[in-house]
């Protein structure tokens, strides 16, 4: 403290120089007055000691300002010390004033005290001038003491809200502006994302961030304004009678006759009209606004942008995958899991499904098993709340026990009404146990539910093998197909990537897709799918040489295109589409298997993934064979493989059957010198199918159509084929399954319907 300068006065005695070694003339004058006052025997010694403590505290405050005053974000220990010294100074000054008033000679000492305080003001003005404007929390302790010496003001911030409203929030250290104003905005039907906050500085409004520490703005005035492009309007209320089950968005009670806003959908009773939020926000347009802003700040990669542009020019666009499977992907539809925080009391219940009876379209005969008297709970929010909530603050407990023992079930609600005292105690302890259990378990990956433990699958005979694994017939709650993947000792990066892709595969449900049933990691990575009783398309065409009619071949092509269109709509690239992976049931239903799994179909070196040329080269697109891009696989590469499958269907042969050199095929196809010979197609092949085959086998990737267009072309072709219609005069009994001998039971004679033709001879003919 030897460097402390600009003190509030040191005194004439040698002991007083200890507090301030560099005494200025003004400070000396003030100290001289204090010393003369102290020399007066009528002044109690306590007052003199308090004045010395005041001076010492002021010097400490000045030292803190000199050391940390110029920093924009000072350390927290400095803020704590500054607050401690200012509080101590205020208490000493109050004590001094009380003593002077009780002695009746407060005038003389007020002058000396004022001189001392003025010294602090003048000496620390340079330190205060270098403070940033955002550090207005460092107020001059002199001004605080003079304005209200007996009751120091709490740090607050005045906020002017939209629609000529205002509020006051406390300025707590470590709390952001967003957290401080969130409740006030929610009460008015607003969220921080649709507003901007400004501070008044030098008569001008300057925007600040929502994540700014509110303690830096102590004593200032903030203005919150709604963004210009936010669709904010006034309510458009109409009287409405709700014939379907509806609830008031304020009191959550049954609503039959009331009012509804045509813009935001807010419903309420007439008695609840005073609690309706003043602001009307069209959340549908607001969601689109936030999504557009997201794409502005998170641009789509160039490869995906070109892919989307190609899809749009071809008249279709691949849909995005499900939300829980993509994580950071860009092309995801925002509807499944909206990241936009919507205020609970003001979002219409039938729009965001938070009401107690979620309304949804369903069959009138289907039982409404969704009816529940407990509001749906987001598990992530519940775990977070359970982590910070005390034992007595829990309102709804959730345990890992069966539904019958849930604390929020109907049974417990009735028991709570009968005996509120004991039930409240049991509920508190139950929630405490659940909270501890949730902390122990942590966050659980949903893909773990699809992992089949080791030993539950009985592996049977070997069916076949390929580039990526070996297929076995197995038993797991029935017949299944088990594909043991050629990945030995997977690294953590491989295993995590494998689980991420499994998270996508487990959501595939389509009539032309093999049903994914689970996966196994021990003793090695394996995929479990449904068992297909039929044979593969390759076996039908090239092994047993089944002779299909043209109408059947076109239907097989249609089903294959339909299944691939579904996979691409889920943003799943097959990467290995061929006739070996297309299975036919006995009724000629197509099932596509071995799709996705880019992790397995790649070469790994440590934690880095590289694409490799593996699999069946006959179905590989030229860009895949060249391997010039980091990831040559795309929707169009699957289209090329589908074109080869069409070639197999329409010719009954494999392409390049006249070339026996594998390396020659790789070189010529990759360079674009070799294409399948379309002159070998069957004579009865429609010209439209031949044209479609040629388009799918284009050498340039961007010139190939996508599966929505391919499927539409095949369906149009199937409808245009001539068909033999059933004769309208054919008896319908034969179609019903009656046999010829069944009619003998009813062969009884009738005068109205004679059976034997000879009977007509008995009647005379005139």
UniProtKB/Swiss-Prot annotation:
Effect of residue 597 to R: In LNCR; also found in an ovarian serous carcinoma sample; somatic mutation
Composition bias type Low complexity, residue spans: 314-341
Zinc finger (Phorbol-ester/DAG-type) in chain: 234-280
GO cellular component entries: cell body; centriolar satellite; ciliary basal body; cilium; cytoplasm; cytosol; glutamatergic synapse; intracellular membrane-bounded organelle
EC number: 2.7.11.1
Chain residues that bind Zn(2+) 1: 235, 261, 264, 280
Domain Protein kinase: 457-717
GO biological process: animal organ morphogenesis; CD4-positive or CD8-positive, alpha-beta T cell lineage commitment; CD4-positive, alpha-beta T cell differentiation; cellular response to calcium ion; cellular response to xenobiotic stimulus; endothelial cell apoptotic process; epidermal growth factor receptor signaling pathway; ERK1 and ERK2 cascade
Main localization of the protein described in the UniProt heading: nucleus
Residues the record lists as Omega-N-methylarginine modifications: 671
UniProt record similarity statement: Belongs to the protein kinase superfamily. TKL Ser/Thr protein kinase family. RAF subfamily.
Protein name (record): Serine/threonine-protein kinase B-raf
């Amino acid at each position: 403290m030897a460097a402390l300068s600009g003190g509030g006065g040191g005194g004439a005695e040698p002991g007083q120089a200890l507090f301030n070694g560099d005494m200025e003339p003004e400070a000396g004058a003030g100290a001289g007055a204090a010393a003369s006052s102290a020399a007066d025997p009528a002044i109690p010694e306590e007052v003199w000691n308090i004045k010395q403590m005041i001076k010492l505290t002021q010097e400490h405050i000045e030292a803190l300002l000199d050391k940390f005053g110029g920093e924009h974000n000072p350390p927290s220990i400095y803020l704590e010390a500054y607050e401690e010294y200012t509080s101590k100074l205020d208490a000493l000054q109050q004590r001094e004033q009380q003593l002077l008033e009780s002695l009746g000679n407060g005038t003389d000492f007020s002058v000396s005290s004022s001189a001392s305080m003025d010294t602090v003001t003048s000496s620390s003005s340079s330190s205060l001038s270098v403070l940033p404007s955002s550090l207005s929390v460092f107020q001059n302790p002199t001004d605080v003491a003079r304005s209200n010496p007996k009751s120091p003001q709490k740090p607050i911030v005045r906020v002017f809200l939209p629609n000529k409203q205002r509020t006051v929030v406390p300025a707590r250290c470590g709390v952001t502006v967003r957290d401080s104003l969130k409740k006030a905005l929610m009460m008015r039907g607003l969220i921080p994302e649709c507003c901007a906050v400004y501070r008044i500085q030098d008569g001008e409004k300057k925007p600040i961030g929502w994540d700014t520490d509110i303690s830096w703005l102590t004593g200032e005035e903030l203005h919150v304004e709604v963004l210009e492009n936010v669709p904010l309007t006034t309510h458009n209320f109409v009287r409405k009678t709700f014939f379907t089950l509806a609830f008031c968005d304020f009191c959550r009670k049954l609503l039959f006759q009331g009012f509804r806003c045509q813009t935001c959908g807010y419903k309420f009773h007439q008695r609840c009209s005073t609690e309706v939020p003043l602001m009307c926000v069209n959340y549908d347009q607001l969601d689109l606004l936030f999504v557009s802003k997201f794409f502005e700040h998170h641009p789509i990669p160039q490869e995906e942008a070109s892919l989307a542009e190609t899809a749009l020019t071809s008249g279709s666009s691949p849909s995005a995958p499900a939300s829980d499977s993509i994580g950071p992907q860009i092309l995801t539809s925002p509807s499944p899991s909206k990241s936009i925080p919507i205020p609970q009391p003001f979002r219409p219940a039938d729009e965001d499904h938070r009401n107690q009876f979620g309304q949804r379209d369903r069959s009138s005969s289907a039982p409404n098993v969704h009816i529940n008297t407990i509001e749906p709970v987001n598990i992530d929010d519940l775990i977070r709340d359970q982590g910070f909530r005390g034992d007595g603050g829990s309102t709804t407990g959730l345990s890992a026990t069966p539904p019958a023992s849930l604390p929020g079930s109907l049974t417990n609600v009735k028991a709570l009404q009968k005996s509120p005292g004991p039930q409240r105690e049991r509920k508190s302890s139950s929630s405490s146990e659940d909270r501890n259990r949730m902390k122990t378990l942590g966050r659980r990956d949903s893909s773990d539910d699809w992992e089949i433990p080791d030993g539950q699958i009985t592996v049977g005979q070997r069916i076949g093998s390929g580039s990526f694994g070996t297929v076995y017939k197995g038993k797991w709650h029935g017949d299944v197909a088990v594909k043991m993947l050629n990945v030995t000792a997977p690294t953590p990066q491989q295993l995590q990537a494998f689980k991420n892709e499994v998270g996508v595969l487990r959501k595939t449900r389509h009539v032309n897709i093999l049903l994914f049933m689970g996966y196994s990691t021990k003793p090695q990575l394996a995929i479990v799918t449904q068992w297909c009783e039929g044979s593969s398309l390759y076996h039908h065409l090239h092994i047993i040489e089944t002779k299909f009619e043209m109408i059947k071949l076109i239907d097989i092509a249609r089903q294959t295109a339909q299944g691939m269109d579904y996979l691409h709509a889920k943003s799943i690239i097959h990467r290995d589409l061929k006739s070996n992976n297309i299975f036919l049931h006995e009724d000629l239903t197509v099932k596509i298997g071995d799709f996705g799994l880019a992790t397995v179909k790649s070469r790994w070196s440590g934690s880095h993934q590289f694409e490799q040329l593996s699999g069946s080269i006959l179905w590989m697109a030229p860009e895949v064979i060249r391997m010039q891009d980091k990831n040559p696989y795309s929707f169009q590469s699957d289209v090329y493989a589908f074109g080869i499958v069409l070639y197999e269907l329409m010719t009954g042969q494999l392409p390049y059957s006249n070339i026996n050199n594998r390396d020659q095929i790789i070189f010529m196809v990759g360079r674009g010198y070799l294409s399948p010979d379309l002159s070998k197609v069957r004579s009865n092949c429609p010209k439209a199918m031949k044209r479609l085959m040629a388009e799918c086998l284009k050498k340039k990737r961007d010139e190939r159509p996508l599966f929505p267009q391919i499927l539409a072309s095949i369906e149009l072709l199937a409808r245009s084929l001539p068909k033999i219609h059933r004769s309208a005069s054919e008896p319908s009994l034969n179609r019903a399954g009656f046999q010829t001998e069944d009619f003998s039971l009813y062969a009884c004679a009738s005068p109205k319907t004679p059976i034997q033709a000879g009977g007509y001879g008995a009647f005379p003919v005139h």
